[in-house]
Amino acid sequence: MHISRPRRVAVLSVHTSPLAQPGTGDAGGMNVYVLQSAIQLAKRGVEVEIFTRATSSADAPVVDAAPGVRVRNIAAGPFEGLDKADLPTQLCAFVAGVLREEARHEPGYYSLIHSHYWLSGQVGWLARDRWGVPLVHTAHTLAAVKNLSLAEGDTPEPAARQIGEQQVVAESDRLVANTTDEAKALHELYGADPTRIDVVAPGADLTRYRPGDRDSARASLGLDPGEIVVTFVGRIQPLKAPDVLLRAAAEVISRSPGLPLRILVVGGPSGTGLARPDVLIELARSLGITAQVTFLPPQAPERLADVYRASDLVAVPSYSESFGLVAIEAQACGTPVIAADVGGLGVAVRNGETGLLVQGHRTEDWAGALESLVTAPTRLAELAAQAPRHAENFSWEHTADGLLESYRKAAVNYNNGTGPSDFSPRRARGLWRLRRTGGVRT
């Protein structure tokens, strides 16, 4: 199928940089998605410029992240110490920076806008109308969905966010959902037109995340080759639920005191509630499993691949996940996954074939599922053998192809006047021409 390609796409990622280390602050799967999809789009002949908010005075205004991929760090508000909840106060400054950059070029410099997360969608909505180009939006997470499955001690998403999401959903020319479940939520909870939603699964870098030697991976991490290693990778926050894994592990250890179980927690602080590693350290102490739990800071991708290879099992106990890149990366390395049956994890993990899906977050349920795997090496080996084959279905190449098709549909809708807005592209270009010529029509 022929897919027409935009010449240059403006990608908006306001609250987190694609260059940030995943697992720290607000950096996670979305950062990986934005950067890796951009790299693959560039390989297909599409120039990508990613606009993100600068968070350090040391951030260069422009960074060439890869051939054809440029990251623009926009100064908007204080560089450090600005809470994510306060970012809406800096959207005007961010918009000004984005529009100022576009104004340096002739109209039509950007063929299309792709916004990620609702804050970026607000910026994209305005830029779309000013530039006269289509807007494609990926939510990544939705307030209404998160609030339906809050972890204990977590803070509900504010009504202002849901209102903002509703506006972006209504104004976008196309919406990209990670899974059919997310597409259903966009329709049922936000009233999105199903015909404007494209389901495009995220992927993994299958050249980096692939099976390897477990013993050498463990040696590089200082892990005992004789232990059964169960690993959590992600931001330490209530939503990701690392405490669920620790409580389940404590129960398993109490049932089988001689079991050589090692829990490896890889990640940094983020969010509210269980936001600091020392809180998890204290939880491990109170559960009596301090000696069986190891904490590591967030790891670079090359090192993270060894973390997956060193593990017998990777746990993803999240309360909400639009997809779950960790699950795909782990399986690509030949490691099965035990995950909560929420959101996109039902797609990322093939239940009973490449891992197990657990209903709910009760300690007894998780302990039972965990015990059924860590005490059955033959079953673990069978799941591990199937895992890479399943992961092969998810690559950033496939993601980029899906995005290009969504971009094509967005352009068709926009140019035919069948998008969500009746704002004419011709009128938009005319307004900019007036602005650029000081109000004199040309």
Curated annotation (Swiss-Prot):
Q: Which residues bind UDP-N-acetyl-alpha-D-glucosamine?
A: Q21, P22, G29, R235, K240, Q299, E321, E329
Q: Which keywords describe this protein according to UniProt? A: Glycosyltransferase, Magnesium, Metal-binding, Transferase
Query: Which residue ranges run through the membrane?
Result: none
Enzyme class of the recorded protein, top EC level: transferase
Q: For 1D-myo-inositol 3-phosphate, which residues are the binding ones?
A: H15, D26, A27, G28, G29, M30, N31, K84, Y117, T141, R161
| Role this protein plays | Catalyzes the transfer of a N-acetyl-glucosamine moiety to 1D-myo-inositol 3-phosphate to produce 1D-myo-inositol 2-acetamido-2-deoxy-glucopyranoside 3-phosphate in the mycothiol biosynthesis pathway.
Similarity field: Belongs to the glycosyltransferase group 1 family. MshA subfamily.
Q: Which PANTHER family match?
A: D-INOSITOL 3-PHOSPHATE GLYCOSYLTRANSFERASE, GLYCOSYLTRANSFERASE
Write down the NCBIfam families for this protein, in alphabetical order: mycothiol_MshA (TIGR03449)
Q: What is this protein called?
A: D-inositol 3-phosphate glycosyltransferase
| Gene name of this polypeptide | mshA
